[in-house]
Structure formats: C-alpha cells, structure tokens
C-alpha cells in the first residue's frame, strides 16, 4: 500500500517514525541494539493510512532534488543506506519495515576501475585532451568521475526515477566545481561538466529525482528543492 502512495503523492521515499536505521556492524543486516529511533522533522512529516484503519507517520521525501545534511556522525549516510535498501521489502524485526523507496531508485557512486562500453558520456565528459570521442566511449579502467558519469547514463537508460548519492562515495570533481576552481581552470580547459550543472535538467526534463548526502560542500543548496 505504501509503495502505491509514493506514486500518488509524488514522493520518492518514506521513512516511518520509530524505524531503527543503524545496523549492528558494516557486514550485518541486523539492527543495532539500543539505537536511537528515527524521527521525522515536523516540516516533512506526513501520515499514511494503512489497511484495516491504522495509519503511520514519518518523513515523506518528495520528487525533485533533496539534500540530507548535518554534522559528522549524525546519521546522514545511515539514512541514505536505509533508503537504498528501501527498494526491497523487509521482514518483521529488521527495524526498517516501513522504510520504503521507489523500486526503480538507483544508488550512484564512483566505481574506479570499472569497464565502460560504448556509452554516450558527452553530457558530462567532452573534449578530452587525447581527442577520444565521448559520444561512444569505452574503457577497461574508468576513473572515478568517468565511472559515475557512466552510472548516470545507465540509470537514464534503465528509466530510474531517483538517484541516491553520498558525497563520501562520489568523485568530487564529478559532483561539483567551486567558483575558485572555475577561475583557476577555465571552462574550455575542463572536460568534465559536473553533476550539479545537470541535476535540475535531470529532474525537470527527464523526471529523475536526486537524494544527495552532503557534509562538506554547500553548492547543492542553490539547486535543491528540499
């Protein structure tokens, strides 16, 4: 029922109040004992009616560009990891039974060394110094930025509705170029168009939302909806 509500209300994800998001360890799927329960900020709290007359409250993350921000060790990545796993249904006792994300959402991260085969990366990568054509790009050993650009294009082809991105596992030069760096390296000398320059078009023209964890760069505030 909640998955249907996401579509109806133009939400990409829902996380119920009282959910236990941290895991016992990095290699365990069991909930962390005595963990702090999740509580939605009032400004984003919604109620969803369940079958048989019950209802559940929690955070509803709308379509568009959403930032998850906060200090270190405050659970930003833990929330994103829970949303990543929210494409699956969870068994009772998992702690994330009511963490629900659209089933076609895609985690996007840098994958240094991955292969890329015949992808048009010109949306992000262009005018390479070696003259290599990025409209049909192949490599057996992609850099972090190239691999993440490839992930975006593969997501578009797969018709994903939402990218889930953590600043910590991304290639910095793929996500953003600050104003100082733009002055040091002019646009005609930089072959990478950062994700921040495309994130609005991805939503407004293609219908792909983004949920992004940010802890060190405030650049995405200017393009975020939430």
Language-model regions: role of each:
Residues 19, 73-74, 111-113, 167-170, ...:
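Short, ordered loop/turn segments at secondary-structure junctions
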Residues 114, 124-145, 176-192:
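Flexible beta-alpha connector loops of hexameric P-loop NTPases
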Residues 1, 144-152, 203-208:
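Phosphate-interacting basic helix/loop segments used at nucleotide- and nucleic-acid interfaces
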Residues 22-57, 92, 100-105, 109-116, ...:
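N-terminal pre-Walker A segment at the start of P-loop NTPase domains
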């Amino acid at each position: 029922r909640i998955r249907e509500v996401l579509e109806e209300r133009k939400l990409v994800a829902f996380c119920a109040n009282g959910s236990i998001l941290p895991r016992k360890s990095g290699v365990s799927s069991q909930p962390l004992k005595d963990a702090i329960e999740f509580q939605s900020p009032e400004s984003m709290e919604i109620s969803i009616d369940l079958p048989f007359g019950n209802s559940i409250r929690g955070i509803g993350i709308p379509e568009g560009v959403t930032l998850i921000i906060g200090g270190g060790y405050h659970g930003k990545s833990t929330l994103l990891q829970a949303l990543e796993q929210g494409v699956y249904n969870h068994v009772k006792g998992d702690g994330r039974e009511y963490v629900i994300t659209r089933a076609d959402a895609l985690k996007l991260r840098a994958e240094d060394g991955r292969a890329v085969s015949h992808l048009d990366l010109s949306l992000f990568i262009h005018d390479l110094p070696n003259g290599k054509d990025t409209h049909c790009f192949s490599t057996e050993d992609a850099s972090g930025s190239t691999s993440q650009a490839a992930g975006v294009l593969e997501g578009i082809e797969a018709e994903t509705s939402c990218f889930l991105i953590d600043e910590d596992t991304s290639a910095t030069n793929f996500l953003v170029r600050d104003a100082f760096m733009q002055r040091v390296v002019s646009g005609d000398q930089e072959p990478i168009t950062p994700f921040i320059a495309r994130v609005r078009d991805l939503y407004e023209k293609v219908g792909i939302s983004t949920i992004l964890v940010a802890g060190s760069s405030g650049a995405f505030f200017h393009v975020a909806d939430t």
